């Protein structure tokens, strides 16, 4: 897995990311990381993201709202949404990114009423199993990973209250992305006041 962070100057050597783009080693479309004390900055990417708390707690900022994530709680971030994670000391989080096309028939039509939910669906166990599947790379592992995340997303969406998917970003999110794009284009001459 290759992570590319594009900073406000357009270089890929800093962590001031506005947009994350990753290239996978093979044809897999799912990735799972396990992190202790994770901190990242506000960013977005074209994959959906599922964050699950195994230990401790974390603040997850998602678009215009901050959620407190406790053990056995999860947050679902729709593709394209601006989000960040600030974990407390000794926290353990699983973070799963998956291609938005895998579950498009579900996630393009519906979204949970609230992105924060209790893990009544085996999210933590499934993400752990997915990590092993992706690391072992047995025959057909890509298809198996797609199937595992699809089954998990369907379970969550069947069990949580749903609403129609909103594909229009909030004004704050749109302005934030526009500001970062402007900073990209005018990095050398843009002043804090003008921004």
Language-model regions: role of each:
Residues 61-65, 79, 88:
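Short strand-coil-strand connectors
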Residues 98-113:
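Conserved segment of winged-helix/HTH DNA-binding domains
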Residues 69-82:
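Conserved metal-binding segment of the jelly-roll/cupin
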Residues 80-102:
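Ligand-binding loop in jelly-roll beta-barrel domains
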